[in-house]
């Protein structure tokens, strides 16, 4: 009772301490500033953007970051109140120059900072607008001399001292008004100035080479004042009227994984309206609240039915109220409806209750499947009252010892199976008569629950899966792999003895997330993704084209952000680029856990809303509960929000609902530009088993048109619908003919779907070869073709063609294609191809001893489960002897073991931190290449082991050992004591 009274007190304090009045005037908006940076570590504009964004955010200023000068166009610039430049772009195109100059002349703000005075050197007018150009510099620590202390920009700014580059300018305009100078002897160098340009205002400062200036409070104050001064009067007037929430803070017992000297305070929760005022979304979008407490509580998963109604999974039992009797839980499945069309839910129906920590929901067979470890449960309403009448177990065997590592992200796939992910709690059970056991990764199963496959293993806890419109599969994992690609499912790799971990490739191209709050609390992968969840692409057409089938939404609740992961083709696979944020909040309770395209084409965000996000490892001074999460009475059990992010210029979706008894309605669903409706229509047709709709499916498949992306999505879904109806099993000649003809479709995605749905027979092999898909110009479709060939009847005559194709550079040098050809050759020439996997590892960096060398000692080290510590803090060995160190990873995430030179732990640790932010860091096992690293294992997966055999250094002393996985080394370390 005391803990709930404490929470109530916190909430009351938050209400009383708020200096806030809600103004429902849309004109009162946050200032929107576009920051143009560049891709360079010198003058690191990305880091500059993060610092400035965090400093200005709670004052109502949004920073949108780009490195692309092509964003200097009339349409894009018009969205912003001001443009800040911190970059070294040598040249500017005529169209970009015209757009930039006209933008400022029209009355918008311009804020060039530091190196911006040496940007666009081919534009004299740009230099004139800035007010001067960089000429040369030295470096040093110097003080700002304030020239005009009465100017609004200098209000509250003290004369500050900082280390920076000592800029000297040339081509200084006559109309600048100097605010600060850098004085060196008799020389007074203008260092901060303002000027007018047309109707616009320009603020320039030469300060800002690196963090020594960026983090100076007076520099930041001057820069923020400069931003506010530079925007036009209308924008500033609206901004001045903007409510700026000031949440209350109180002392509380909170984990301090980062070991910050100042620790943390507990922010009081905000109302949904207040929280929105501390949120940032793209400038041409609006944030709408669909539902919040008390109508909903702790939503953890969502899905929509064929009527476009939102269903959510609520769990107040999560994470530690694990009940022995699962039918006695407090968790519910709830339907949320907007009955009057105002965009907000006004009807809430409990479909089923008494669940205990359900974690996902999807629709199948006229009902829903709920993930509630250890079971998958099928629920169905049989009398139309929106209450579950049928409740039966579908699959049993999901691990229960850790509630944030169980099954999640259930989705109906194009192949008419249910897909999902699971964390390290894994699965161990019987499906039909097949005994299955697997750990973290991705799986699929039939909607009936009678068949299941493990498709790919991941490196750590996993809570996210998504499909592209061309049926590519992407995954997010919690720790340092927020974007991954399922390249070749494990059943294929198994044929050549490859491990399940090689099915999935880490493709994320960056480490950092970009937060707008300074109060970041993470256990590891600091400032990176340590709790990533979800990986849903934008698969509708209501948003601008740059989003279509290209930008995936990855949630990071510890960072309070929804990340934009830009997915681009790379050979037969993909790579991810940093798209910054789709949504970010300075409300320290905002906890996005699922972000997905809804029936209306908007993006819906499920906000778990909780100050405490971290599950484990157990912080000092705390204990774990039954769900393996550390016990903290501050874990919230009452809040929850659902938002919609709507594009302001979007057109309304034509489809509002589908009628499963109306074939015309279902065909319209397949023709929708929203993948939700296409998938829902496909599911309903397959579930109906109505083959009378087949001719209409043929018509969709035979349509040769493609959209702006080269996709014909209706044809793709129509092909998979045929497969789901069972007409492509080899006995329906017309269906086979239509699908085979689609092998020549202009859309690569249609060709891929066609070859995948064809039956596994000789006729399909002949059709695929005739269409030339083994040499398809689209490498992703080519990959699917080669994998399909590996399943088809053995054809010795195909061997020479496979061998010739395998040698082509685009196949040989492609990770996935080279493996696929090996699999296909193994199938068609099984005796002469030796591709058995050799998974025994020799630890690189170790001193390899002859087999006859006597091992003086064997040391076995393991991590302590969930503690991020080794179970052996020290061990002792004799100098010059040969020893073996066996590292057994019994934890649930990757770890390694590095033995270092004496006194080098901090140096190597710092190098490991830097390597963690390198896109190639994972490929290097996060092991810095430096002489201080004496011996090391690779990254060892859960349940794996690796042995180091080496000769102990001759010099006695203390040799540290660490785990160099991002963020671990400060906690996970020990000492090898070498004695004479």
Predicted regions located by residue number:
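Catalytic beta-strand/loop cores that center a nucleophilic Ser/Cys/Thr
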Residues: 132-206
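Extracellular/periplasmic metallocenter environments
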Residues: 931-980
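N-terminal edge beta-strand
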Residues: 853-882
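Beta-propeller domains with acidic blade repeats across secreted/periplasmic ectodomains
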Residues: 32, 55, 62, 66, ...
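Beta-strand cores of secreted/periplasmic/IMS beta-sandwich domains, seen most often
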Residues: 309, 466, 874-899, 946-960, ...
